[in-house]
Amino acid sequence: MTTVTDEDFFAALPLFSAFEGVTDPGNYRPLPDGWVLALADIVGSTPAIAAGRYKDVNMAGASVISAVLNSVGKGDYPFVFGGDGALIALPGSLEKQARDALAAVQVWVEEDLGLTLRIAIVPVADTRAEGLDVRVARYSASPYVTYAMFWGGGTSWAEKQMKLGRYGVDRAPAGTRPDLTGLSCRWSPIEARHGEIVSIIAVPGEGRPGQEFRDLVNGIVAITTEQNRDSHPVPVDGPNLAFSLHGINREAKATAPAGRRLRQKLIIFLQLAITVVCYKLGIPFGRFDARRYKRDVAGNSDFRKFDDGLKMTIDVDAEHLKRIETLLEAARAKGIVRYGLHRQASALMTCFVPTPISRDHMHFIDGAAGGYAVAASRMTGKSLSTAPSMI
């Protein structure tokens, strides 16, 4: 019998490529004993979004994934991006590296982005002591990238504990910088092509996903599949070659200390110029193929996920959206679901690209005017007007 090590756990999970598989309990496996959850979210994301700073909030959430994965050698560990935060599951042997990375990114987010990042490390064993679990599935978004799906109630419980101030991590000294190699936010917002970009969060009304909730998720997914490419917000050939100056400035802040940021911006502009020229001419630059890279951006994007509930940011027309809302509202009336939904004109993409030559670059999708954070605020009964987007 083959023994699967902690390092190989996620890679050894069976793959599924039809997104409907997120509701199949047979696709999930419990995290090994002794693992921990490294998680973070932005405190006060609501006023930041209302001030038009959602890209900063998104950047902070993605930086958690970049910092933690870089600190542990970019191993293949399950994680999920939540818009204004993130969660990474790791073997207990890597807890110290994860603590150091979380503490460093907390300082960076505060000093460079002017936001407050809440951080925690929660043992998986503690979720099981509460009668919950953290089970993980491996969804193949493309031949080159897989994303983790989480089920069992444990990640939601861990997030609640973090927000209550438990399982905290000691603060790092001022000036501490995380390793954010590969973190990128160069792309301009991606405009809706079918109607609107809609961010949806749907979680079980009774705390755990029973059959009625699974049927609801399958019904929503079935509606989205009626549109081209399952209502994917990124065109099949990738986003337009349009780049955000604010995003480039943010990326330079993330990947270079203060004294080297001008140089870093020049490097980024040079990379973008090469990309545009190679794309227009259809020629490679060494091993970098701009047209292939742009297509892979679309295929590798995480526009839908399951983390103790359904999260998706889709490009949907009015008729299909109405049917989705009707399903959700009927299920809410029966106590099957709690949900939040937010419409906006465009989507945002924040990227983790260890090397553009490799095809396993990852792209995190959210709405450009509040996305998941606004959807979550509506689920909890808060009021937040549509936020402008400072891109």
Please tell me what each predicted stretch does:
Residues M1-I391:
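Regulatory and interdomain segments flanking nucleotide-handling catalytic cores
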